Structures are given as C-alpha cells and as structure tokens.
Design a protein with these regions (language model features):
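Long amphipathic alpha-helical segments with strong coiled-coil/leucine-zipper propensity
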Residues: 1-5, 91-93
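N-terminal acidic leader/helix
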Residues: 4-30
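Low-complexity intrinsically disordered segments
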Residues: 38-41, 45, 49-95
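Surface-exposed, polar/charged faces of alpha-helical domains
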Residues: 27, 31-34, 38, 45
Length: 95
C-alpha cells in the first residue's frame, strides 16, 4: 500500500469498471435497465462507504494499525466489487 491517494484512485477505478459494465449491459439488454441501475447505485454507495473508511482510520497515530486498516480495506474492496460484478453477471445470464 503506497499511500492514501493510490487507494482512493483504486476505489474510483473499480467504480468506473462497474459503471462501464452496467452501461454496456443496459445497451445490450434494455429490458433489465432497472435491475442494472440498482447495481450501479449500490456500487456508488460502496464507493462512498470505502472512501469514508479510507479517510478515517481507527487509530491514525499508530502506523502499524493504519497499515492493517488499509490492508483490510483493500481486501474488503476486492470482495465487495467482486460481488457486484457477480451480481451483474447473474442479471445478464437471465433471459
């Protein structure tokens, strides 16, 4: 983990990927626009939650705990955005 700026850019990048995939899904399956839009809204809420956690570590004056906090945040980010991609895939599989 290099620094907070890199982490925030990574969170934004993941959000952009989800939103782009949702836009493409809407283009190909306009009948599922409402379900896909809900995934987009959930992704934005996740981004805001992750930013709030990134900006407010539990113990900001203890470098060891800050590193652990950011490592846990990165793992949570991978997990949550992975679940959003899976949710979008399930929506796209339905006919």
């Amino acid at each position: 983990m290099a620094n907070l700026r890199v982490l925030k850019k990574e969170i934004d990048y993941r959000l952009e990927e989800v939103v782009f995939d949702c836009d493409m899904a809407i283009c190909f399956q306009p009948s599922k626009e409402k379900e896909i839009f809900e995934v987009m809204q959930e992704a934005v809420a996740v981004r805001n939650d992750l930013f709030a956690k990134a900006m407010n570590p539990a113990e900001p004056h203890n470098p060891s705990l800050v590193r652990k906090h950011y490592a846990a945040l990165r793992a949570e980010m991978d997990d949550v955005f992975g679940k959003l991609f899976e949710k979008l895939s399930k929506i796209n599989e339905k006919k």
